[in-house]
């Protein structure tokens, strides 16, 4: 019953992986139907998507969607391929938000995208990946349109790194948040290691404090991943309990959503 068997015409090979082609309307509907089935059958709190839309580029090889793009153009479509790919993802995100809330309006919908919208945005920020032109994810647009209940940008850099400054990036995402959705940045907790690592426990502590100062109404953050906390790598669990997790956290209320029935 796997999609690579039942829906062979929806799947393409890119590198060593099989991908459902977002340019195929049936592929998008298939994914939405799977999510809708989970929402309807199970008592879930939310639907969370990670940072995979179109795949991360593999060298100079382009994603193999010539057939679906040709069908779009033959049908009268006018968008260039980049804008067409973004429109496919935009439509999926919008449809997902509406579909989930049509069934259970209290279920949260959130996405954790790559933490930098584009290289040079905001000014001075550097990135080896342009998610707008590489993953075809126009994340600021999703925020502006209110197609998310929370956004968890993967801010996996320290506060004092000029090229990818945690605070500068967090401020940027808050500035895009005209609908007042929750902004809960992802922290790179998994990079903490006993005996050293790319991230120190004090850095996480400072980032958590910063997120609380920036948003006193709906503060929050997400750890990637819980493994370091559970293993208390470099005593991070104990330090956070002592310095920033001193009280039980209440589940946030998202005021634009109804209460669970």
List each language-model region with its residue ranges.
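Substrate-binding cleft of secreted/luminal carbohydrate-active enzymes
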Residues: 136-162, 174-260
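Short, solvent-exposed turn/loop segments enriched in Gly/Ser/Thr/Pro and often Arg
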Residues: 50-56, 113-116, 227
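Active-site-adjacent "subsite" loops/lids of carbohydrate-active enzymes
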Residues: 1-41, 134
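Secondary-structure boundary elements
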Residues: 36-50, 98-105
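Active-site-proximal loop/short-helix segments
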Residues: 1, 6-9, 41-80
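Short beta-strand segments at enzyme active-site cores
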Residues: 46-50, 109-112, 223
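Active-site mouth loops of central-metabolism enzymes
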Residues: 16-30, 122-133, 194-202
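Glycoside hydrolase catalytic-domain groove-lining segments
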Residues: 62-124, 129-195
């Amino acid at each position: 019953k796997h999609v690579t068997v039942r829906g062979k015409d929806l799947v393409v090979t890119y590198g060593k992986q099989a991908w459902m082609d977002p340019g195929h309307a049936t592929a998008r509907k298939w994914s939405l139907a799977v999510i809708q089935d989970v929402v309807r059958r199970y008592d879930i709190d939310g639907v969370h998507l990670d940072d995979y839309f179109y795949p991360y580029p593999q060298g100079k090889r382009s994603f193999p969607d010539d057939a679906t793009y040709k069908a779009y153009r033959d049908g009268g479509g006018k968008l260039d391929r980049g804008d067409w790919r973004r429109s496919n993802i935009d439509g999926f995100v919008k449809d997902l938000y509406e579909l989930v809330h049509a069934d259970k309006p209290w279920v949260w919908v959130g996405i954790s995208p790559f933490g930098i919208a584009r290289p040079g945005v905001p000014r001075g920020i550097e990135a080896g990946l342009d998610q707008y032109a590489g993953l075809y994810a126009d994340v600021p647009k999703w925020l502006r349109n209110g197609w998310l209940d929370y956004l968890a940008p993967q801010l996996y850099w320290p506060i004092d790194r000029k090229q990818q400054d945690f605070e500068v990036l967090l401020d940027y995402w808050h500035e895009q948040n005209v609908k007042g959705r929750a902004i809960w940045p992802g922290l790179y907790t998994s990079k903490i290691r006993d005996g050293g690592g790319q991230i120190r426990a004090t850095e996480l502590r400072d980032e958590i404090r910063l997120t609380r100062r920036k948003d006193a109404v709906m503060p929050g953050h997400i750890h990637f991943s819980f493994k370091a906390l559970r293993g208390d790598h470099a005593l991070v669990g104990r330090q956070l309990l002592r310095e920033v997790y001193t009280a039980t956290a209440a589940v946030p209320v998202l005021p634009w959503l109804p209460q669970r029935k």
